[in-house]
Structures are given as structure tokens and as C-alpha cells.
Amino acid sequence: MDVTALATDYDETLAEEGLVSATTFASLQKLKESHRKLILVSGRQLPDLKQVFPKLGIFDRVVAENGAVLHDPATEEQRLLAPAPPPAFVESLRKRGVDPLLVGRSVIGTLVPNEMIVLDEIRRQGLELEIIFNKGAVMVLPSGINKATGLMAALDELGLPVDGVVAIGDAENDHDFLRRAGFGAAVANALPSLKKTADRVTLAPAGDGVAEIIDDILRGDIAIADASKNDVAIGKIARG
């Protein structure tokens, strides 16, 4: 199957220390010129992404807040894919001194080791929320919301099958994302556990690793099997 789209994480995948290099951006432009789609999938809030990467318009869709927000840069339309954080829950975290405490449209963000307080409040209030780690960051989201669900929402709007997508990431919150795509790649600086999930690990780290994958897509060196890894075999017909 042909590669129809590249979906990439932002921090320490596309970007290093929050910045995308000119070389990496040029690679994105080359892929765009090949009439393939570009999707950014990040745990960051959308206003934050716009600030650190003003050229967000190169992407056909942006999935922010770890799958909770879907954005179309061409129209500036946004779609919330998950409910807002419970106000009482947010207030309880503030009262218990959780700092930093970043509240998005759906995601709540903080840092390790605050996850113990967060987990205690989730249990105490009986909330259906999940804690997702991203290296030293801690994200709290409604159950079932992740980068994979956000990717699927983006592909639905673009009218593309997931089997033709190459996904690339580096951290804990990229596992489902890489598994769901037709082909999953981990950059060289990715966590060891994600490298085990990936179909391939790049030789170069971060943005250079993304450029490496793009070069291989353009050369036709990445082949996605016609039988999706997401399909489940439920039986076999014996002949003879």
C-alpha cells in the first residue's frame, strides 16, 4: 500500500527543545509537494503549538492535547473531541498545591511526581479519567482519549485510511499512535519501550530522524503491507 500521510509527534520528534530546524521543515515541504498529507499529533495545547511553531499551516490537520482537540489550520476551525476538565477536580488539585497545573480545553497537565496527588483525587472523586505520561510530563484526560483516537478523527475528516499512514514519535504517549498507524517509526532518541513498539527505529534523532523517514517515503523505501496490522484474523478456511 502507498504511503498517503505522515503523522508526527512534536516535542523531541519533529522538534528539539521546542524548535523545528530549517532542514526538517524543508523535508516537510518536500513531502507536502508529493501530494501526501501531513498531520501533527501532540500533547501540547493548540495555542502553545501556534506560538512555538508559527508555520503550523503546513499541516493538513493538527491533533492537540493528546487527542482531545482537532484543528484545521486552513480554516482555523477547531473541534473538541473530549469533555472539558471537571471544575471541582481542577480546584481540588490547586488546593492541594499541584504545581505547575496547566488546564487546557480537555487536558490537565503537570509534572512528575504530582501524579500521586492527581491519582488520589481521581479516586476520591470517582472520576473516569486517565493519567498519561510523556517522559517527565503528566497528562490527565478522559478515559479512551489518546493520540490514536485523535489521529483517527483527523483521518476521518481527510477521508484517508489509517493503513496508509506512517506515524513517528518518541515517548510513552506515542505507543497507541504508532500501533494504530499502518507503519510506526520511533526516532533514535525515543524511549526503549517505544522502540520495541515501532516497525522501525531511525538512525538519526528527533527532526533529523523525521527527515530520514520522509526521504525513505519519497524514495519508495517504506512499504506498508496490504494486510493491515490492525486487522485481526478470526479463522482460516482449510482447502484440499
Write out the residue ranges for each language-model feature.
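Mg2+-dependent phosphoryl-transfer enzymes with acidic/Ser/Thr/Gly-rich catalytic loops
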Residues: M1-D2, S21, A148-G240
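Asp-based phosphoryl-transfer active-site loop
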Residues: D2-G18, L178
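Short, well-ordered beta-strand core segments
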Residues: L6, L31, V62, G184-A186, ...
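Basic, amphipathic juxtamembrane/active-site segments
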Residues: G18-S34, A186-A188
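Anion (oxyanion) recognition and catalysis
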Residues: K32-E33, R94, R123, K195
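Short active-site oxyanion
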Residues: H35-I39, D60, E77, S106-V107, ...
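Conserved phosphate-coupling serine/threonine residues in phosphotransfer and NTP-handling enzymes
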Residues: S42-R44
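HAD-like small-molecule phosphatases
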Residues: K50-D156, N230-G240
